[in-house]
Swiss-Prot record:
GO biological process terms on file: ubiquinone biosynthetic process
Gene label: ubiD
The protein's name: 3-octaprenyl-4-hydroxybenzoate carboxy-lyase
Annotated compartments: Cell membrane
Function field: Catalyzes the decarboxylation of 3-octaprenyl-4-hydroxy benzoate to 2-octaprenylphenol, an intermediate step in ubiquinone biosynthesis.
Known EC number: 4.1.1.98
GO cellular component terms listed in the entry, alphabetical order: cytosol; plasma membrane
Membrane topology per record: Peripheral membrane protein
Keywords carried by this UniProt record: Cell membrane, Decarboxylase, Flavoprotein, FMN, Lyase, Manganese, Membrane, Metal-binding, Ubiquinone biosynthesis
Active site residues of this protein: 287 (proton donor)
Substrates-to-products reaction catalysed: a 4-hydroxy-3-(all-trans-polyprenyl)benzoate + H(+) = a 2-(all-trans-polyprenyl)phenol + CO2
Length: 493
C-alpha cells in the first residue's frame, strides 16, 4: 500500500488504531511536547491536536513514534521488512551487470522499480491551493512548537529543505531545524557536511553575493519524508528514491518563486532565499542527546511566499533524551542498514544501533570471524562506508554466537573476550557530531572500537575458553519430564 499524501496516511493510521485525535485545546508552547513525550515513551499512537491554543491549524506529532509506523509508512507490516529497502539501496549503490540469464531474471523486479525513479510534474497542485505573499507572509500564524523550557524560540522541526547546487543535476532534500526569528525569517541550521550546506557553498563560489533560492516543504507524503532521512546514493535525488519505494513516480510541482520542484501534495510550502551575507545566532535548543546545545551562527532563510492546502495540517516533532522520534526512526532504519553493510562486508551477521545511543553514536556488529584482526577491519569499514556512521563514537564487534541486540549477551562478550589494551582501538581527530559537547573540539573528536570476539592464534598465545553448553540429549530429557517436576513457570531473567 502506498500513500499519495499525508492525509491518506493519517486516515490509514486512524483506521488501524495508530492515531488519536485530541479535541481538547493544547498549547504548542511546551504542552504538546510533554503530552507527545509521555505517549511515545509508552509506545502510543500518533497524535493530531485539532485545537492548538491560539491557532486554527491542527498539529500532527509522533507520526513515526514507533518502528511499526515507520514500516506502515512504507507499506510494510513489520519493521524487519524494511530490509527490503536496504537491499534496494545496496543494489543502487553497487549495481552489477547480471552474471547470467538466471541472475538477469532475478534482477527484473529491481529494474522495474528503477522505471519509477523520475518525478512527475503536475499542474494545479494541492500545496498551492492557498498562496500568500508580501505582508500576508506570517510564520507566527503557524502553530510552531516551542518544545522545551530552555529553548530560545519556537522551532520548525519536520521541514524538508529543498536545494540545488550549481554542479548537481539532482535536487537535494534534507531535514534541518529552523529557529523562528520573525514573521518572515528562520535560521537554517545545516551543518557543513550536509547536502543543503554543500549546495549553498557551491552556489556562493559560482555566484558570489547573490541570493540562494530555498524551499521548505512541511507535511509531505510519508515516503518522501522517509526518503529524506535514508542513506540515498549522493548521485540520486530523494524524489527518485521515494518513487522507487512507493512503486510510482513522486508527484512534484514548480515552486512559485523559483525553479525548485516541491512535493505536490505537501500541506505547507515555504519559499524564499538565503542572503549569503545574513547570518544569526541559533539556539540554545534541547536536542536528541538529552541536553541543550551550544549556540552558533547559521544562515538566515527569508520567506517570501507561503503556500498551503485548504485546511492544512502542521507536521511537527520534538527531540530530547531517547527515546524520542528520531531514536524510533533510527531503530527502524537500522534494518535498512543491515543489507547495505552486508553487500560490502558479507561476513556481517547483524548490525544494531541501540536507541539509547542517540540513534547512531554507538553500534554493535556481529560477524562470522575469519582471521586475526578481522574485527578491526570491520570497525574501520563501518566508520568509513556510510556518511551516517562517521559520527558513531563507539563500535563493538562480537562473534556470531552473540546476539548483538541483547545487552546481556554483549556485556558477557565484552567482559570475557576482551583485554582492554589489546582489544581496544582508539582513533583521534575524526568527525564528530557538532552537538556532542563531550568532544574536545566542536565537530572533531575520537572514536573507540571494542573487539569482543574470540581471539585467534596471532591475537593471543593462551588457550582460549570454550563456552559452556548443555548437550541436546539432556535438554530433551528435561523437556520431557518438566511438567512432572512440579516446578511452576518462572520469569525470564
Amino acid at each position: 500500500m502506498s500513500f499519495k499524501d499525508l492525509r491518506s496516511f493519517i486516515d490509514h493510521l486512524e483506521k488501524n488504531g495508530e492515531l488519536k485525535r485530541i479535541s481538547y485545546p493544547v498549547d504548542p508552547h511546551l504542552e504538546m511536547t510533554e503530552i507527545a513525550d509521555r505517549v511515545l515513551r509508552s509506545g502510543g499512537p500518533a497524535l493530531l491536536f485539532e485545537n492548538p491554543t491560539n491557532h486554527t491549524m491542527p498539529v500532527l506529532v509522533n507520526l513515526f513514534g514507533t518502528p511499526k509506523r515507520v514500516a506502515m509508512a512504507l507499506g510494510k507490516d513489520d519493521p524487519l521488512a524494511l530490509r527490503e529497502v536496504g537491499e534496494l539501496l545496496a543494489f543502487l549503490k553497487e549495481p552489477e551487470p547480471p552474471t547470467g540469464f538466471k541472475d538477469a531474471i532475478a534482477k527484473i523486479p529491481m529494474y522495474k522499480q528503477a522505471l519509477n525513479m523520475p518525478p512527475k510534474t503536475v499542474r494545479n497542485p494541492p500545496c498551492q491551493q492557498v498562496v500568500k505573499t508580501g505582508d500576508e507572509v506570517d510564520l507566527t500564524s503557524l502553530p510552531i512548537q516551542h518544545c522545551w523550557p530552555g529553548d530560545v524560540a519556537p522551532l520548525v522541526t519536520w521541514g524538508l529543505t529543498i536545494t540545488k547546487g550549481p554542479r548537481q543535476k539532482r535536487q537535494n532534500l534534507g531535514i534541518y531545524r529552523q529557529q523562528l526569528l520573525s514573521k518572515n525569517k528562520l535560521i537554517m541550521r545545516w551543518l557543513d557536511h550536509r547536502g543543503g550546506a554543500l549546495d549553498f557553498k557551491d552556489f556562493k563560489q559560482l555566484h558570489p553575493g547573490e541570493r540562494y533560492p530555498v524551499v521548505v516543504a512541511l507535511g509531505s507524503d510519508p515516503v518522501t519524508i522517509l526518503g529524506a532521512v535514508t542513506p540515498v546514493p549522493d548521485s540520486m535525488s530523494e524524489y527518485a528514491f521515494a518513487g522507487l519505494l512507493r512503486g510510482e513516480r513522486t508527484e512534484v510541482c514548480k515552486a512559485i518563486s523559483c525553479d525548485l520542484e516541491v512535493p505536490a501534495t505537501s500541506e505547507i510550502i515555504l519559499e524564499g532565499y538565503i542572503d549569503p551575507e545574513e547570518t544569526a545566532v541559533e539556539g540554545p535548543y534541547g536536542d536528541h542527546t538529552g541536553y541543550y546545545n551550544e549556540t552558533d551562527s547559521f544562515p538566515v532563510f527569508t520567506v517570501t511566499h507561503i503556500t498551503h492546502r485548504k485546511d492544512a495540517i502542521y507536521h511537527s516533532t520534538y527531540t530530547g533524551r531517547p527515546p524520542d522520534e528520531p531514536a524510533m526512526l533510527g531503530v527502524a532504519l537500522n534494518e535498512v542498514f543491515v543489507p547495505i553493510l552486508r553487500k560490502q562486508y558479507p561476513e556481517i551477521i547483524d548490525f544494531y544501533l541501540p536507541p539509547e545511543g542517540c540513534s547512531y553514536r554507538m553500534a554493535v556488529i556481529s560477524i562470522r570471524k575469519q582471521y586475526p584482526g578481522h574485527a578491526k577491519r570491520v570497525m574501520m569499514g563501518a566508520w568509513s562506508f556510510l556518511r551516517q556512521f562517521m559520527y558513531t563514537k563507539f563500535i563493538v564487534v562480537v562473534d556470531d554466537d552473540v546476539n548483538c541486540r541483547d545487552w546481556q549477551d554483549v556485556i558477557w562478550a565484552i567482559t570475557t573476550r576482551m583485554d582492554p589494551i589489546r582489544d581496544t582501538m582508539m582513533v583521534d581527530n575524526t568527525p564528530i557530531d557538532y552537538l556532542d559537547f563531550a568532544s574536545p573540539v566542536a565537530g572533531l573528536g575520537s572514536k573507540m572500537g571494542l573487539d569482543a570476539t574470540n581471539k585467534w592464534p596471532g591475537e593471543t598465545t593462551r588457550e582460549w575458553g570454550t563456552p559452556i553448553v548443555m548437550d541436546e540429549k539432556t535438554k530433551q530429557r528435561i523437556d520431557q519430564i518438566w511438567d512432572d517436576l512440579g516446578i511452576q513457570d518462572m520469569p525470564t531473567l
